Regions:
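C-terminal catalytic/acceptor-binding lobe
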Residues: 2-4, 8-14, 176-265
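Conserved catalytic core of nucleotide-sugar-dependent glycosyltransferases
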Residues: 83, 99-184, 188-189
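Short, solvent-exposed loop/turn segments at secondary-structure junctions
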Residues: 15-17, 47-50, 68, 97-99, ...
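Short, hydrophobic beta-strand segments that form beta-sheet elements in well-ordered domains
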Residues: 39-46, 120-121
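Active-site-proximal specificity loops/subdomain of glycosyltransferases
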Residues: 43-94, 101
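Well-ordered, non-membrane alpha-helical segments in soluble/globular domains
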Residues: 23-29, 105-107
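A short, glycine/small-residue-rich beta-strand->loop->alpha-helix junction that serves as a flexible
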Residues: 16-24
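Short, acidic, metal-binding catalytic loop of nucleotide-sugar glycosyltransferases
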Residues: 26-39
Length: 265
């Protein structure tokens, strides 16, 4: 039986696999390995447990990634390394607590055939989940979707947990600190400024975020006032990057919302 090669490489940089984070990250990363066709998957960073789960799931692990003086990964180096090692035409950054199902593969495969240069994003659905997913059960996807549907918390457009893009689109990024605001809007602006189709698959893909606390970092309010956030905001100032809105703290771009995936033809 021949194996269909995926056109997608997913990459992530997990947090330490401690406590609840160990459970939800294992759930998420394992779900990626079950996509059909299975994507190439890279895990970056030397956080506790990353090497072990990479070995267990047959995932490539790259412990080295550039960090700032606060030990925060830098997106320019992270994205550069991912593209350097990827063998596929589509590359995607994803947060390591996001569970994906085959509707995701269907959507991006469809759009890849129709766009040469693109960035695909989507809003997440939040759900409280504190146990391991049983992937041996044929209905695991439906059970998780049902739980997310009951919670009925689809986050707004500023909560983007995955960015799927055509190869070469994200070359030469600015050195933003990962997870310190601004960089997600910057990626959207960059895609549009480079002539890419910006595609929102939220209506057709339920990307499920397993809720967690923020014990891995400073309190949310403290992070917003941190030197890293201030530095990120300075880099996105419109004096250096022109935006259509000229709004100093926000990149305004228009996205095409994908409301239906036609599987015929």
């Amino acid at each position: 039986m021949s194996v269909v090669k995926s056109d997608l490489t997913l990459f992530a940089i997990p947090k330490n696999f401690h406590g609840h984070f160990a459970t939800i990250q294992r759930n998420a990363i394992t779900s990626w390995t079950r996509l059909n066709p299975r994507p190439e998957i890279f895990l970056f960073g030397d956080e506790d447990g990353t090497a072990e789960i990479a070995g267990e799931l047959g995932i490539r692990h790259f412990p080295e990634v550039a960090r700032n003086e606060f030990n925060t990964p830098m997106i320019d180096d992270l994205f550069r390394r991912a593209e350097q090692h990827a063998t596929s035409p589509m590359i995607g950054y994803i947060n390591s607590d996001i569970v994906l199902t085959d509707e995701f593969s269907l959507a991006i495969g469809h759009l890849h055939k129709r766009h040469e240069k693109f960035m695909i994003v989507g809003r997440r659905w939040d759900v409280d989940w504190d146990r391991s997913l049983d992937f041996s059960q044929p209905g695991w996807e439906d059970s998780l979707r049902a739980a997310a549907g009951r919670a009925n918390v689809q986050r707004p457009g500023n909560c983007i947990d995955y960015f799927i893009f055509s190869r070469g689109l994200c070359n030469g990024l600015l050195p933003f600190a990962l997870g310190r605001f601004v960089h997600d809007n910057y990626l959207l602006w960059l895609a549009r400024s480079r002539g890419a189709a910006l595609l929102d698959i939220s209506p057709v893909v339920m990307a499920i975020h397993q809720n967690h606390d923020y014990s891995h970092s400073q309190a949310f309010a403290d992070v917003r006032q941190s030197p890293e956030v201030r530095r990120n905001r300075i880099m996105q100032d419109p004096g250096g990057i022109s935006t259509r809105s000229r709004t100093p703290r926000k990149f305004c771009v228009k996205m095409e919302r994908i409301g239906r995936i036609d599987t015929g033809g």
